[in-house]
Amino acid sequence: MDYMSAEETPTIDYLGIHEAFAESEYGITLAANVRYGKYKPAEVGNERWEELLGPDVNNLDHLVDTYHLADDFVSRTDRLQPGLLTQHDKAAIKISAIIHDWGESIIPDINYFEKTDADEAAERQAFADNLPNFYQGDDAATQELIAEATETIIFDRESRLGNIFNIIERIGYLRTGLRAAEHVREGSAPDCQSHLRWLAASVMSSDHTTRLVRQSDLLAAQHFLVLRQVDIHEAFEASRDPAIFTSLEPEQAAVRGQGLQEARVIWDAWCAGREA
């Protein structure tokens, strides 16, 4: 499908689109659910979970949180790499942030570490089937931008902009893991201590840090790593407990432990390279 040119990029009220969605039955469904729910103690309520980890762990607020991350990322890119992103690129990335999890109001959120290709396909189908209900605005240019973002960014991580948006999402995952690790380090959430340690270790055992380290052509991603270098180091330190994954099946625990070790090696090499 041919999409609009950069010169045709509309002026978008991103937060207005979100507010309209939030008031719909789909937005209300998202608002009632939390992310990283498998790590939340059963006796801890959603409000407490969100108080500890911020808006990113509310399924609805996560969309606005990602939008602000995307807005910051493109602004930093403008300063660090002028001309890398066109106005159209920036609009497509920002609208992706606002809409990317709309499908989870139909297909419940699945933890990043457990999502399969089949889960992704089901979410994509739910998104396509329900898009006319998700967005009921009558602006044709906005509708076209949403369709473009859906096809070429949200569900195509291999495209140039899809990769950039995926990096932004990974910054969000990492940031939540760092919040969890901070509570563990400070002992500020005794009602969730072991669960937050498990969450932090799960995030750090993924390839989020590795992907950011290897994305050397995106200076905004490197800038995030520099800003949070101490926090990332301390999150790895907080995840050193060898018993941290014992609640998992042995095979899963081994995979997580290996992932944590490999991510730490790559991270330490990046830090050493900066100091050389």
Feature annotation, model-predicted:
Residues 5, 9-13, 37-96:
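Alpha-helical phosphate/pyrophosphate-handling elements in metalloenzyme active cores
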Residues 7-25, 81-87, 91-94, 136-196:
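Histidine/acidic-rich helix-loop-helix segments that form or flank divalent-metal centers
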Residues 12-14, 156-276:
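Divalent metal-dependent phosphate-bond-processing catalytic cores, especially two-metal-ion Mg2+/Mn2+ enzymes
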Residues 66, 90-109, 169:
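His-Asp-centered metal-binding catalytic motifs of divalent-metal-dependent phosphohydrolases/nucleases
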Residues 78, 106-111, 138, 142-143:
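Membrane-helix exit/interface motif
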Residues 110-126:
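Post-HEXXH active-site segment of zinc metalloproteases
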Residues 122-142:
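Post-HExxH zinc-binding segment in Zn-dependent metallohydrolases
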